[in-house]
Amino acid sequence: MDAAAAAHEPLLAAAPPTSGKATAADGYGRGRHEEGRRLASAEAKRLLRLAGPIVASCILQCVVNMVSVMFVGHLGELPLAGASLATSLANVTGYSLLTGMATAMDTLCGQAYGARQYHLLGVYKQRAMVVLAAACVPIALVWAFAGRVLLLLGQDAAIAAEAGAYARWMLPSLAAYVPLQCHIRFLQTQTVVLPVTASSAATALLHPLVCWLLVFRAGMGSKGAALANAISYGVNLAILALYVRASNTCKGTWSGFSGEAFRELRQFAVLAMPSAMMICLEWWSFEILVLLSGLLPNPQLETSVLSICTRVSNEIGAGQPQAAKRATRVVMYMALSEGLVISFTMFLLRNVWGYMYSSEQEVVTYIARMLPILGISFFIDGLHSSLSGVLTGCGKQKIGAAVNLGAFYLVGIPMAVLLAFFLHLNGMGLWLGIVCGSIIKLLVLIIVSCCIDWEKEAIMAKDRVFSSSLPIFWAATPL
């Protein structure tokens, strides 16, 4: 070492290596470490550019239902309980199923776009709309007779009647919800995320006005809040449909409606059903909490509070980014940081959050007691949602569905029933049980993600895309 170098050598520097081999090995190790940090930093920036608008748009989309429940909550405890129960039934029997089936587009469109088979994205979007529209027929029948269904499930008669009326006024929302979900995924899988965020923001800003006009100005009460959802979904859909038709960004992926949408429907359904089950099995477990809360003492209070906790959890936790090998590690760090910040914020705001949903002091106080548990739930949910996104990106929805089935239905819900009904923890016990299921899911998904063979997955994705590829001259013809 020369004098100049020695002058800058720290006093407590490590002893120099004793051989040239060691020096080369250390240099190689440091080089790999620096390269890994550089790649991780680049991946984090890329994910934030993509995921930031996606997360924002998902939260803004949840604002529609959230604001509707807020308006109903200020009509009284019974309307809030009825609207909450109807929304939970709609989520269990409709929205969760449709959202889950639409996530098949995340796999198909995402991999087709990566393989530069751009014309397939438009075909997949139309195919998804056909399959989801068919699924709406039985869903509409359940919603039309929601009051009777809830009575059969043992719910309070007054709450069931209120919920039945609310559910019937939610029926028009199906007509807009299906194409809206397909348009959103069609754009997001092309990394076209800012228009989705902008349309969701415009809808979120408009929705409170629509709710006020229908609920109070027109005197429709809770029914007006349900109808407002359909109007806002329709506005969001109209904005995105105009963008797809007019934008140069979608020229290569959308060329109009095509008869190809009616081909290979079975193949789409084969992927859509595991996708739906993966989403539904987790989503249903949270909505079952609301249904179970109707069987507790003071069902109006328990149902109101549990539904608010479910809405808050869904709206904040929506939209975790999807990634692969290196991105998985990066997104877990991001989810960890996000979870800590939002959980802490929820804890600080626990005494004021309830006033957004209800003027009843009893409801507000109960929510304040529940929010610390909800913060823990959200923190865990952020981590396992990121890993679930990895499975969706790989097309492994069957594994995700099996994990959700075991975690929530063999552990979470039985534990919730035990804590709520046998240990008499009521609504708090229901939520603690689901937290137990979430912890099991997180642990299992960590193990599954560590076992993924990424090279094999890349080959399978390529095979899946090109086995479905259409000749360019088969692509849709503009109307």
Could you say what each language-model-derived stretch is?
Residues M1-A51, L108-A176, L194, T203-M273, ...:
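Short alpha-helical transmembrane segments in multi-pass integral membrane proteins
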Residues S19-G31, K45-D106, M273-S293:
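Signature of the first transmembrane helix
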Residues V55, I59-A81, L150-A157, L213-M220, ...:
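Helix-terminus/linker motif at the lipid-water interface of multi-pass membrane proteins
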Residues A56, L60, V64, T93, ...:
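Residue-level hotspots within pore-lining transmembrane alpha-helices
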Residues E77-S84, S88, A163, A167, ...:
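Small-residue hotspots at the loop-to-helix junctions and early N-terminal turns
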Residues G82-L98, I231-V235, T303-R311, I439:
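Alpha-helical transmembrane segments of polytopic membrane transporters and translocases
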Residues G100-Y113, V290, C309-Q320, S388:
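Helix-loop junctions and terminal segments of transmembrane helices
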Residues T107, A176-S200, F378-L405, F421:
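Membrane-interface junctions at transmembrane-helix termini in multi-pass inner-membrane proteins
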